């Protein structure tokens, strides 16, 4: 993109965007999906504000918007939708709920992102190998071919699950040690961010197990005995 195009793009106003829309013979904004998409793609406030989160499967607001958001989560709420509809109504005369819903779906899908994948791809390796020393460093395990191999396998599986969701990996890394040894802390470190970690699996027969798994990267099953108390 040329510098001139970038400057012009950044200087767009709501009036500029209105000029890009289709209007009726009487000058009213047509209630079309195309018009709504044009607004969401070009409005100085809404542009790139709504993205589909491939990890959670939900739509997120990822930048500042002209209404108060009391929830720390980026996930779009009903209140966000109401405020967005009011913004489109006030600035562009777009009021059709069907049109707005379709426009949001199209644009968010065009702007989809994966927070963990984006994080991984932002990293630059400093040339220092760490996997082979992870278990000895954090948990005091003996450094051996086994501890090195099992950690490499687990980390490769974690990365693979991000790039190929659902890839087969049915091996559990089991840590045995006294309470307070740092086992849970270790898994939290692996998850990088608290919201990507969960230890909320009390029972395998929990009817909400799939919902609890969603949106997390590293899952800790606190007690292995749960495997034996749940029906197979």
Predicted regions span which residues?
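Walker B catalytic acidic pair
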Residues: 222-223
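Hydrophobic "anchor" residues on beta-strands that sit immediately upstream
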Residues: 218
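Conserved small/polar residues in nucleotide/adenosyl-binding loops
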Residues: 228-232
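N-terminal nucleic-acid engagement/recognition segments and initiation subdomains in replication
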Residues: 1-130, 145-149
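P-loop NTPase catalytic core of nucleic-acid-dependent motor ATPases
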Residues: 104-215
């Amino acid at each position: 993109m040329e510098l001139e195009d970038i400057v012009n793009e950044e200087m767009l106003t709501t009036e500029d965007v209105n000029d890009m829309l289709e209007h009726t013979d009487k000058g009213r904004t047509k209630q079309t999906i195309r018009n709504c998409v044009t607004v969401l793609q070009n409005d100085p406030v809404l542009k790139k504000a709504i993205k589909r989160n491939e990890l959670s499967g939900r739509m997120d607001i990822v930048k500042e918007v002209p209404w108060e958001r009391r929830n720390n989560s980026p996930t779009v709420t009903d209140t966000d939708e109401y405020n967005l509809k009011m913004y489109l109504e006030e600035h562009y005369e777009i009021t059709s709920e069907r049109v707005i819903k379709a426009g949001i779906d199209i644009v968010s899908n065009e702007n989809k992102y994966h927070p963990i994948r984006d994080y991984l791809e932002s990293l630059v390796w400093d040339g220092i190998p760490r996997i082979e020393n992870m278990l000895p460093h954090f948990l005091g395990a003996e450094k051996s071919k086994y501890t090195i191999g099992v950690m490499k396998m687990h980390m490769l599986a974690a990365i693979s699950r991000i790039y190929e969701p659902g890839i087969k990996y049915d091996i559990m890394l089991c840590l045995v040690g006294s309470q307070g040894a740092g086992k849970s802390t270790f898994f939290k470190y692996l998850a990088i961010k608290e919201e990507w970690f969960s230890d909320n699996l009390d029972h395998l027969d929990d009817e909400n197990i799939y919902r609890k798994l969603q949106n997390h990267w590293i899952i800790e099953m606190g007690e292995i005995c749960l495997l034996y108390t749940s029906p197979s």
